[in-house]
UniProtKB/Swiss-Prot annotation:
Keywords on record: ATP-binding, Host nucleus, Late protein, Metal-binding, Nucleotide-binding, Viral genome packaging, Viral release from host cell, Zinc, Zinc-finger
Compositional bias (Gly residues): 458-481
Organism: Human cytomegalovirus (strain Merlin) (HHV-5)
UniProt function note: Component of the molecular motor that translocates viral genomic DNA in empty capsid during DNA packaging. Forms a tripartite terminase complex together with TRM2 and TRM3 in the host cytoplasm. Once the complex reaches the host nucleus, it interacts with the capsid portal vertex. This portal forms a ring in which genomic DNA is translocated into the capsid. TRM1 carries an endonuclease activity that plays an important role for the cleavage of concatemeric viral DNA into unit length genomes.
Sequence motif: Nuclear localization signal, positions: 822-827
GO biological process, one term: viral DNA genome packaging
Known partners and oligomeric status: Associates with TRM2 and TRM3 to form the tripartite terminase complex. Interacts with portal protein.
Protein name: Tripartite terminase subunit 1
Sequence segments annotated as region (Disordered): 438-488, 799-831
Length: 850
């Protein structure tokens, strides 16, 4: 099956990406090795030159007609590959003449100049223009959102020029590598996609701006965790099978690499021991009470995530791994080229200190290893702090699981006695009671706990429960009643004897005891909260470190936004030079404009139609980036407009002005603000905010006037905008252009005008059989009525034209009287119905036109 053009472009793009990754790696290699192995590079360079000459001009032409994310990326990639290939070739030629590794790397990496800054000039009118400085991918994304907000007041030629500049800046920032450089993006700055993701999840009472703070963006630069090098060491061993037989010491280096990370840490090994103990029990086995408690505590230790898992890597292991890989590489290099490798990483190690080298990482170790090392060092720093140790020891889950495991390891002679898990826990609590906690409270707590477990478990633990209760000396069952009564009597006697020796007020309230209880409760609460905060801090910093150090690919968001904006500007300019578009300004004059306005100015819109018309105003005021109204499950137009305003950073009072404009009004005298032939002419505006409000009012007049026109004349005109492709089923099209802001599709023809009401007059009137377009005579309303009645120039759309049976002079001598109050059923309205004199008799209307 033959591939189509899109599939062929995808294949070309895939091969170019493959070569781009290889070329990016060659920039960091030893130039001596490159000169020795230059044949594949020259062959690929010749292929890139051919593709650049053959495909690049066609891709550029395609993007100036209709762009897509693929064609824009291919245009950017082909030009970058052509430039970088030529640059590397020149650097290799210069190195062959004068070997200087530092000069070679400065040339291929462009270290002597900085071209990653650009200033964009935006001109809206002769008096409104701005300069915006861009330096990162986040700046480009935010600037594109602002361009979307001012899409309607930006000329298409200026918009296309700005998009071309942004594409050039993207090429300079990203280069040929799919891996984003750390200096071209800011990980803590959110984007439009982050905003949209947060709008569809529960906010839990927090505002959107507050939730965006501290969020790591994964759309401008997409995080891709890299694989661990120790996992791939087997692949390396398979690749070096031929060299292992010829280089004896390689086998020892490979075996040392494989065994380096085999040892695992025993930190918190009781968790694994608990899981091993739980595997012996299932649904059909007797479950002792201690096993149920162990399962319960293990579950809570997992879900609450209060146990720190130590990362099994040390800085010594990483250093040894780096040295072993360096020895492996140099051994292969000496065998193949007769000298050690001296690439940019070897040169860089000499210029970095210990901490900088740790964050830069190793060329042999995956970034995940560096992240694990930093996390391990952070946890170790906390562990060295006595406060953290106290918090860790106060962890209730840790204590319970540890002592239950100790109880399981301890042999029981007959399954009874005080060595069960309850007895152990109560024994520990008894020791705590000696420092201020009452034994009575602990005994009551244990009896409640034991009764709860006895209700849940029916097998294997009854005797242990009974023995535990007897050991304590108090229980809930009748068997232990005597012991409980005796213990209570002894305690009461001791308390009475002790209270007789002190002040009588102590019988009412034991202040010292209450202080101790409250102090321990407060310390326990502080310990739990503090420990949780420490764990959350470590996890947050680990995510941030992963974003900083791990691999981040350039996301498609910026190119997607540029493609949508370019297509919008291209659609707006495609009818500029079309000779088939008729300008109605050459056919009609101010009289026709005034005719339509006078027939609409005294009418009013139904109040119930304003919400739907407001949605149409939002649709026409919005740009092409946020169009969720076309999704499978569409959102309303005001939601799209809210997304556009929030991502552009519009101030709240400006949003309020937009909402008031979109709410509309039913009276035409309040929305008819555009002068004759002045639609979308903002040359008098001196400020961007004023310019934007004027644009909103022009859009409001378009929507409400067309709606009133449909209501008055019985028409069904629909409105579209040139934000995407031209709608063949719409009648009035808003182009946002100053020269021809409005188009009318009518009877197979396309008309343009700078005045809305001339287009409405064009739609209302139709050419007669001779092909002459009628014009409204300059006369009084009564004369215009008579002329329209006689001439028959206007007719209803679905009724054939018939000559009038009445002579033209018959209307002159008819006396004026009040029209009868009887109303006819509304039919398709004609100009004659509107132009009829209010006080004229109904017999004036010819029968053929009634």
């Amino acid at each position: 099956m033959e591939m189509n053009l899109l599939q062929k472009l995808c294949v070309v793009c895939s091969k170019c990406n493959e070569y781009a990754m290889e070329l990016e790696c060659l920039k960091y290699c030893d130039p001596n090795v490159l000169l020795a192995e230059s044949t594949p590079f020259k062959r690929n360079a010749a292929a890139i030159v051919y593709l650049y000459r053959k495909i690049y001009p066609e891709v550029v032409a395609q993007n100036r007609t209709q762009s897509s994310l693929l064609t824009l990326y291919l245009e950017m990639l082909l030009k970058a590959l052509h430039e970088d290939t030529a640059l590397l070739d020149r650097a290799l030629m210069a190195y062959s003449r004068q070997p200087d590794r530092a000069a070679f790397y400065r040339t291929v990496l462009r270290l002597d100049r900085c071209d990653r800054h650009h200033t964009v000039e935006l001109q809206f009118t002769d008096n409104v223009r701005f300069s915006v400085s861009l330096a990162t991918l986040n700046d480009i994304e935010r600037f594109l959102c602002k361009m979307n907000y001012v899409y309607g007041i930006l000329a298409p030629e200026a918009g296309l020029e700005v998009c071309a500049q942004l594409l050039e800046l993207l090429r300079r920032l990203c280069g040929i590598s799919p891996v984003a450089r750390q200096e071209v993006y800011v990980e803590g700055t959110t984007c439009a996609q982050c905003y949209e993701e947060l709008t569809i999840i529960p906010n839990q009472g927090r505002s959107l701006n507050k939730r965006l703070q501290g969020l790591l963006c994964n759309h401008i630069a997409v995080h891709r965790p890299s694989s661990q090098s120790d996992v791939n060491i087997q692949t390396v061993e398979q690749d070096l099978l031929d060299l292992t037989t010829r280089i004896p010491h390689l086998a020892g280096v490979l075996s040392a690499l494989k065994s380096l990370f085999s040892s695992s840490s025993a930190y918190h090994s009781y968790i694994q021991e608990a899981e091993e103990a739980l595997r012996e029990y299932n649904l059909f086995t007797d479950i002792p009470e201690r096993i149920y408690s162990l399962s319960d505590f293990t579950y809570w230790s997992r879900t609450s995530e209060v146990i720190v898992k130590r990362v099994g890597i040390t800085i010594q292991q990483l250093n040894v791994y780096h040295q072993l890989c360096r020895a492996l590489m140099n051994g292969i290099s000496r065998h193949l080229y007769g000298e050690d490798v001296e690439d940019i990483f070897v040169l860089g190690e000499k210029a970095l200190d210990g901490e900088e080298r740790m964050f830069v990482g190793s060329v042999f170790a995956a970034p995940n290893r560096i992240i694990d090392l930093i996390t391990s060092l952070s946890i170790q720093a906390f562990e060295d702090n006595p406060v953290f140790n106290k918090l860790h020891e106060s962890n209730e889950m840790y204590t319970k699981i540890k002592h239950i495991l100790e109880e399981i390891r301890r042999p029981l002679p007959d399954g009874t006695g005080g060595d069960g898990p309850e007895g152990e826990v109560i024994h520990l609590r008894g020791r705590e009671a000696m420092s201020g906690t009452g034994t009575t409270l602990m005994t009551a707590s244990n009896s409640s706990n034991s009764s709860t477990h006895s209700q849940r478990n029916n097998g294997g633990g009854g005797r242990a429960r009974g023995g535990g209760k007897k050991a304590v000396g108090g229980g809930a069952n009748g068997q232990d009643g005597d012991g409980s009564e005796n213990g209570l009597r002894v305690r009461n006697c001791d308390e009475h004897e002790a209270l007789d020796l002190v002040d009588a007020r102590s019988r009412i309230h034991n202040v010292t005891r209450e202080v101790n209880v409250r102090k321990r409760a407060y310390l326990q609460k502080v310990s739990e909260v503090g420990y949780g905060k420490v764990i959350r801090c470590i996890k947050t910093q680990e995510r941030l470190t992963s974003k900083l150090i791990d691999v981040n690919l350039v996301g498609p968001l910026c190119l997607d936004f540029i493609s949508k904006l370019m297509n919008g500007f291209l659609y707006r300019s495609q009818y500029h030079q079309d000779q088939d578009v008729v300008d109605v300004g050459n056919q009609f004059t101010y009289d026709e404009h005034l005719y339509v306005v006078n027939n609409l100015i005294h009418k009013s819109l139904p109040v119930e139609s304003l919400p739907l018309l407001g949605q149409q105003i939002y649709e026409l005021c919005n740009g092409p980036l946020f169009t969720h109204c076309t999704d499978r499950y569409p959102l309303s137009h005001n939601v799209d407009m809210a997304y556009a305003c929030d991502n552009a950073g519009v101030l709240p009072h400006v949003k309020d002005d937009l909402v008031k404009c979109a709410e509309g009004t039913v009276y035409p005298s309040e929305w008819m603000v555009v002068k004759y032939m002045g639609f979308f002419n903002f040359s008098d505006c001196q400020d961007l905010n004023v310019l934007q409000k004027e644009m909103w009012m022009h859009v409001r007049e378009l929507v409400l006037s067309v709606a009133l026109y449909n209501e008055t004349f019985g028409k069904q005109l629909s409105i579209a905008c040139l934000r995407d492709e031209l709608h063949p089923d719409r009648d009035v099209i808003l182009t946002y252009n100053k020269e021809w802001p409005l188009l009318l599709r009518h009877e197979g023809s396309l008309y343009k005008s700078k005045d809305l009401y001339l287009l409405l007059y064009r739609h209302l009137s139709r050419p007669d059989e001779s092909g002459d377009v009628p014009t409204a005579p300059v006369a009084k309303p009564s004369t215009l009525t008579a002329a329209a009645a006689v001439s028959g120039a206007f007719r209803e759309p679905d009724r054939p034209w018939l000559p009038s049976p009445y002579p033209s002079s018959s209307t002159a001598g008819v006396s004026r009287r009040v029209r009868a109050t009887r109303k006819r059923p509304r039919r398709a309205s004609s100009l004659l119905d509107l132009a009829r004199d209010e006080h004229g008799i109904q017999d004036l209307v010819p029968g053929s036109l009634r």
